[in-house]
């Protein structure tokens, strides 16, 4: 009986070519596993394609709700953003995928897991750190790094290899954008984006969105509710988190929200440029932050921001299954105990504008914030506070004055 390998399978040219290569090189039975994180129509026809390519079995695993509830929500609650712009769409999905690959490998008694990530990107790190953290005994095969036995260097090479092994599928040899899509976002790399001096060709590029210039000329108001930091409804309709994200994607895409063009620092040391569409995610981050502003005290908000930056780095680097990520998430969850309320905002040509926030746990006090005199706040108290708060500055200034006098 042959040993088994679980292949992270997308149905694209790369992973299709890997199937006969694994059989030929290692004499494995190949169990393909396509993890559905919300990529939608990209899954059409996969079963037939995997069978024609020589796979022994195909799993199509729907983890959309797991992805939304256990990976997206913690990052939203933390407000984790990598390098101030990237909302971690691909980064969050990789540990969720790695976890399910390990579960299938255990179920099939597979000796190895194979992925098709290249040797220059971040995904190889994210997949392999996730797999290693959960199953250190399982072998990992990364064909694109095995240049002594993986000899295909272009799409043309892969198409020829497939045809030589009886796989004649309608793959296009011409290069196109490299895309990654899931419930949260879609990323675009390649073609004109490889030169940062080029403006993206948005007419050909965008999939989920329209540009702000082509968005409707009329603003649209949206109301959302949260309970303990978890989104619960849109415009009065309660939904599970994944459906809320889908609805926000529809609304945000319509109004040109969440299109970013960034040059980011990859884990492996090089810079890469990409255009990301994250319409729903951008709205969800903004709505959650809008509510938090009303509820969190200053000290907690300051520390939470520090934790958010660290969490974003951990997620980006593939360190989801680590004690530090768990500790940061536990802290963030504790801050969400009272993040309950309703936010209203309007969407207009790429912008999100606040239009009102309410919460039973609001720390905002109109009587304190106004300029009228109240029972809780005596304006005279500010004098003593300012004297103490500015004492270090006063001591330093007096010291410098004395030094200057002594030097004359």
Residue ranges of predicted features:
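Nucleotide-activated chemistry modules centered on ATP-dependent adenylation/adenylyltransferase
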Residues: 2-408
């Amino acid at each position: 009986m042959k040993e088994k390998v679980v292949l992270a399978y997308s149905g694209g040219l790369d992973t299709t070519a890997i199937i006969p290569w694994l059989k030929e090189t290692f004499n494995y039975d190949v169990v393909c596993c396509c993890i559905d994180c919300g990529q939608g129509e990209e899954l059409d026809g996969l079963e037939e394609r995997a069978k024609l390519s020589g796979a022994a079995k195909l799993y199509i695993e729907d983890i959309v709700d797991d992805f939304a509830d256990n990976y997206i929500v913690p990052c939203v609650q933390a407000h984790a953003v990598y390098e101030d712009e990237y909302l971690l769409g691909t980064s969050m999905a990789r540990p969720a995928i790695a976890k399910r690959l390990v579960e299938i490998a255990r179920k099939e008694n597979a000796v190895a897991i194979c992925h098709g990530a290249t040797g220059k990107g971040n995904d190889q790190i994210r997949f392999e750190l996730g797999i290693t953290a959960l199953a250190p005994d399982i072998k990992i095969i990364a064909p694109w790094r095995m240049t002594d036995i993986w000899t295909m260097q272009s799409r043309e090479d892969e198409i020829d290899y497939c045809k030589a092994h009886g796989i004649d599928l309608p793959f296009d040899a011409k290069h196109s954008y490299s895309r990654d899509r899931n419930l949260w976002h879609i990323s675009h790399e390649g073609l004109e984006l490889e030169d940062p001096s080029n403006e993206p060709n948005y007419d050909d590029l965008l999939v989920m969105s329209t540009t702000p210039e082509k968005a409707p000329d009329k603003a649209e108001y949206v109301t959302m509710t949260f309970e303990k930091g978890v989104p619960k409804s849109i415009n009065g309709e309660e939904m599970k988190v994944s459906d809320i994200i889908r609805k926000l994607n529809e609304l945000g895409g319509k109004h040109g929200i969440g299109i970013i063009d960034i040059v980011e620092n990859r884990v492996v040391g090089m810079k890469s440029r990409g255009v990301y569409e994250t319409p729903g995610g951008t709205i969800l981050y903004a709505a959650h932050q809008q509510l938090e502003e009303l509820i969190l005290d200053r000290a907690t908000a300051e520390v939470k921001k520090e934790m958010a930056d660290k969490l974003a780095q951990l997620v980006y680097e593939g360190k989801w299954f680590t004690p530090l990520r768990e500790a940061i998430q536990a802290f963030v969850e504790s801050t969400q105990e009272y993040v309950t309320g309703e936010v209203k905002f309007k969407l207009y040509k790429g912008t999100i504008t606040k239009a009102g926030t309410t919460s039973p746990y609001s720390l905002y006090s109109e009587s304190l914030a106004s300029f009228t005199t109240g029972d809780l706040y005596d304006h005279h108290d500010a004098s003593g506070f300012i004297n103490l708060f500015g004492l270090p500055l006063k001591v330093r200034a007096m010291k410098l004055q004395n030094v200057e006098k002594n030097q004359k």
